[in-house]
Design a protein with these regions (language model features):
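Bacterial N-terminal signal peptides that target proteins for export
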Residues: 2-16
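C-terminal motif of bacterial Sec signal peptides marking the signal peptidase cleavage site
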Residues: 23-25
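Surface-exposed beta-loop interaction hotspot
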Residues: 133-142
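Acidic, serine/threonine-rich low-complexity disordered tracts
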Residues: 27-130, 145-234
């Protein structure tokens, strides 16, 4: 994965704070810091200073870091998506870099991007072996218990030759649940998409809140594995 996500730390509060700091680093085209950057810069510096102090044996002088809260995110008035990739130890907050209606592209500060169509992953860039494109179910199809469809993933193989994986998929209903994302509870419908082919099986999960995919766990590639997305701020 690109540098932006790689900079996040394994501890949850470190990951959240540094991800927020990365989000804050985006400024205008003249290089001026964004309002978000100005707001969290001092917190990030203080926290990193505390980490260095503890490493130097000065834990007694280090203050406990403040966790990233919903208020921290919402006051800037921009949509924010959280992405967690367990296989890479990555946990980051993403902002929109391109919006074409149904297809929205979210990015890190170093240009790693994730494109989702109505919340369903169709493309990645900057992650090494990328998902070049995908044929995926519509939002309506996700809610059809027992519904079936084909899902196709397109990758680049040896010598940049395109390869395709085709799965036969079935939707199933897990039920109504309440999930919490950055201190806010959401009542959602949990559905599972089970996809099979002769060489194996994958399982994608979606937590639907009306017409919004509030949370998901989606397979991206053999190397990356699954990515968990949370729509933190609309």
């Amino acid at each position: 994965m690109g540098k932006g996500l790689a900079l996040t730390m394994s501890a949850k509060w470190k990951a959240g704070l540094l991800a927020l700091a990365m989000l804050a680093a985006c400024g205008n085209d003249k290089g001026a810091p964004s309002p978000l950057g100005q707001a969290v810069g001092s917190v990030a510096k203080a926290t990193l200073g505390g980490i260095k102090a503890r490493r130097a044996g000065k834990a007694g002088t280090a203050q406990a870091p403040a966790p990233v809260t919903r208020a921290d995110l919402e006051k800037y008035g921009i949509p924010i998506l959280r992405a967690v990739i367990a296989s890479r130890g990555a946990d980051a907050l993403l902002t929109i870099s391109d919006d074409k209606g149904e297809v929205v592209t979210w990015s890190t500060t170093d240009g790693t991007t994730f494109s989702l169509r109505n919340g369903v992953l169709i493309q990645t860039r900057g992650m090494g072996p990328d998902l070049m494109s995908a044929q995926v179910p519509t939002l309506g199809m996700l809610g059809q218990t027992g519904g079936t469809h084909q899902r196709m993933y397109y990758f680049l193989g040896p010598e940049d030759q395109p390869t395709r994986r085709t799965y036969d998929c079935t939707m199933s209903l897990k039920g109504r649940e309440t999930i919490t994302i950055f201190d806010r509870k959401h009542t959602v419908t949990h559905v599972t998409e089970t996809c099979v082919r002769p060489q194996g099986k994958i399982e994608n999960e979606f937590w639907l809140e009306g017409a919004t995919v509030r949370k998901s766990r989606q397979w991206a590639s053999g190397l990356t594995g699954y990515i968990e997305f949370e729509k933190a701020v609309d």
